[in-house]
Amino acid sequence: MEYVYMMGFLAALLMALGLTPLVKRFAVRVGAVDAPNQRKVHTRIMPRLGGLAIYLAFIGAFLVALPLMEGYKPHVIWGLLLGATIVTIVGALDDRFDLSPKVKLLGQMLASGVVVAFGVKVDFVTLPFGDGTQMGWLSIPITIFWIVGVTNAINLIDGLDGLAAGVSAIATGTIFVLSLLMGNVTVALLSAVLLGSILGFLFFNFHPAKIFMGDSGALFLGFSLATLSVLGFKQATLVSFVVPIFILGVPLSDTFFAIVRRTLNRTPISAADKNHLHHCLLALGLGHRNSVLVIYGIAAMFATSAVLLSTVAQWVALIVIAVTLLILQVGAEMIGIVQKGKRPVISFVQRLLSLKQSERM
């Protein structure tokens, strides 16, 4: 079975390498370009629509590998492919015509509804040290909310060359590893093919980028990752609920901090700003490439935690969760991603240390 995964991965990688230059020329020809402005980091007009190359490589390679596959679930596959096609079309139209947020949201909800209609749902949740809970009819809105939320979270971090693609590749690789451990052949093949298509595109998208993925890429990757995470972790365990959140830790935490920041500043949650994780790292003077590499490292930390959560005892999993969240909070305070100058956890630790020093004296 392993050769099928490898074949799908290599086919997607080669297709993405071949398709991306063609999509780049097509984007310029149809006027799907991204002009620099106050919020953006790039300083010259860049072609968008890179997501089309990722999508086409994914579809093409998957169709090549699928006939060699055994034990897959066809309804799940076609639900994912149909939903992914919808969001990619919506994203491509936005790359060219700048659709309104309401239209894009409607397209995302439609794609999510298609996946749910094909039977992909979050229908079981387990709480720590408790019994599992069947979600019943709530599984439908919860699944749609999850898919739409992750889709937009990937879109939010797409602010530096190679950032969204690299973080998505790390998340996809993690899903692939965990799906192998759990014996989920359908998710393993889908994630192997998706990983190959992302890496092939990343060759052209890493700094200095020759093409942007655009909304066609961000929406496709976010939708695919959200759906794969639902497919891969439906077991009745504590970590089945937490693992997908950790796999997508970078985009989800950045989105969470953005919501908190805008709430504290009394600005609309949908209002754009330059205080996302990559903006904060740039402000520290790390530079474009180093900022991206640091975020790759954070994504790898979340990925490692996700794998540990799936392989250790429950009490160890709770410790891993607590330590990871503590590191995340301290890091957020150090770079000022929520509010500059406010460091509650760091200040608390400093007060404890000063008290201990005074007691010794």
Where are these regions (language model features)?
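Cytosolic, membrane-interface loops and tails of multi-pass inner-membrane proteins
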Residues: 21-46, 257-289, 355-359
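Membrane-interface capping segments at transmembrane-helix boundaries
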Residues: 22-26, 331-347
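Hydrophobic membrane-spanning alpha-helices of multi-pass integral membrane proteins
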Residues: 58, 197, 284-306
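N-terminal hydrophobic signal/anchor transmembrane helix of membrane proteins
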Residues: 231-237, 323-340
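Extracellular/periplasmic helix-loop-helix junctions in multi-pass membrane proteins
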Residues: 303-322
